[in-house]
Amino acid sequence: MDYLQNRKENLRKQVEDIAELSALPATVVQVMDVINNPKSSAADLASVISADPALAAKILQVANSAFYGFPRKIATVSLAVVVLGFDALKDLVFSISLLQMFSGGRAEQQSLRKQFWQHSISCGASARFLAKKLGRRLPGESFVAGLLHDIGKLIMSQYWWEDFKRSLELAEREDITFREAEEMTFGANHAEVGGWFAESWNLPAQLAETIYYHHTPLMARTDAQLVSLVHMANILCHQMGFDANGRPRELVLEKKALEPFSLNGRRMSEDCLLGMQEQVHIQVQKATVFNHILNAG
């Protein structure tokens, strides 16, 4: 076994250990349990959320933002549950919790983490917009998938900062993709690391697959449409400058990933996708409420 293969296997074990230690807050687990119980009522869910005032406040903050665009104020958690519905609440609670995970480190780590989340929020908002535009059910799931797609970068920069920084420098110096630099440094890339983490967390298969294959969507099997949506959203965000590591031209659109989609009766094309940039930018701006939550800590 060569050095990089050995490093990859050791890295996977370490990521699995990190996932065990990075458990979601107890309230979030309770919320998920209530939502997944077919006997649960809206009152049951509202009761669990209301028991965590900080989470409840953030849910109301997002529910009353331009992100959802409801015409009247949602003043209570009970009303938020009724108006948003269980599926949207599940995605929202999970997203809010993710934004508050992983902290500390050096100033440059914190700066990079902020850029990471800004890119991820933008990608989530873009994926949600594309899901609505292209007729996919449950656009909130697309937002979560977009938010999570690069979580491998977050983990690598949090726990192996010097190696991660070395990968950034290597990509710049050798003019190679960041994934290539990661593989030379770690023996694995961020998509693999994120996928291992998602599997260890027992996330739904379609979310784990989206993380694994957001750069290689044709490899997806569980939910190829979701993976393709996030792939497209990621490309758009990089093209528009919503980029986590400042290398916007290194990503390549997998054109075959567009084939399952149509818009206004016509098959989706690269020109059509890139022509949505103005609309996508508006949706990204509406998602700034998540940046406020991130900055509030």
Identify the residue ranges that each predicted region occupies.
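All-alpha prenyltransferase/terpene-synthase fold signal
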Residues: 99, 262-265, 282
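Short, surface-exposed acidic
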Residues: 139, 205-207, 264-276
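A hydrophobic, small-residue-rich beta->alpha segment in the mid-to-C-terminal subdomain
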Residues: 245, 255-266
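Generic low-complexity, intrinsically disordered sequence content enriched
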Residues: 240, 257, 262, 277-280
